[in-house]
């Protein structure tokens, strides 16, 4: 079974949304995969996803059950087969922390899609449309990633 970790900064908007979407898409496509999410900072550790992210995702039928924010741990670089970053800043942070022998596991989530976007924009300080855009980008990338 492949293990996938999705990472953003605080693990309350983008990466938990990606976790929820990947779980649902994997179940639909009958792909046996373990999915988790984390943040590069631990400020929101133990908190549920941002209410706006959760509301947008639930409107599309995704479950955020059991998802709580956590900071990435050193053992994650060993445990997971794929570590997908939401943006270049978080990818750089991951590359700085990741042992050389596991660097091949790191990539931008959107590098696995046909999107014109390279990064998933952080919707935290924006309006509702930002959360919808995150879902649009993540849905496309999740399906393409799982079908590879």
Regions found by a protein language model. Give the residues of each.
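Conserved active-site segments centered on acidic
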Residues: 1-79, 147
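Helix N-cap/beta->alpha junction signal
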Residues: 15, 87-88
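Hydrophobic beta-strand core positions in alpha/beta domains
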Residues: 6, 84-85
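Phosphate-binding/catalytic loops
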Residues: 82, 88-148
């Amino acid at each position: 079974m492949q293990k996938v970790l999705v990472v953003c900064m605080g693990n309350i908007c983008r990466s938990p949304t990606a976790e929820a979407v990947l779980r649902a898409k994997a179940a639909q496509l009958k792909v046996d995969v373990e999915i988790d999410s984390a943040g590069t900072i631990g400020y929101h550790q133990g908190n549920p996803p941002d209410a706006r992210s959760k509301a947008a995702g639930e409107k599309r039928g995704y479950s955020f059950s059991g998802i709580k924010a956590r900071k990435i741990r050193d053992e994650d670089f060993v445990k997971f087969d794929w570590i997908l970053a939401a943006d270049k800043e978080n990818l750089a942070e991951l590359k700085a922390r990741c042992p050389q022998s596991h660097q091949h596991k790191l990539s931008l989530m959107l590098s696995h899609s046909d999107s014109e976007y390279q990064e998933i924009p952080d919707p935290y300080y924006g309006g509702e449309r930002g959360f919808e855009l995150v879902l649009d980008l993540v849905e496309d990338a999740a399906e393409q990633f799982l079908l590879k």
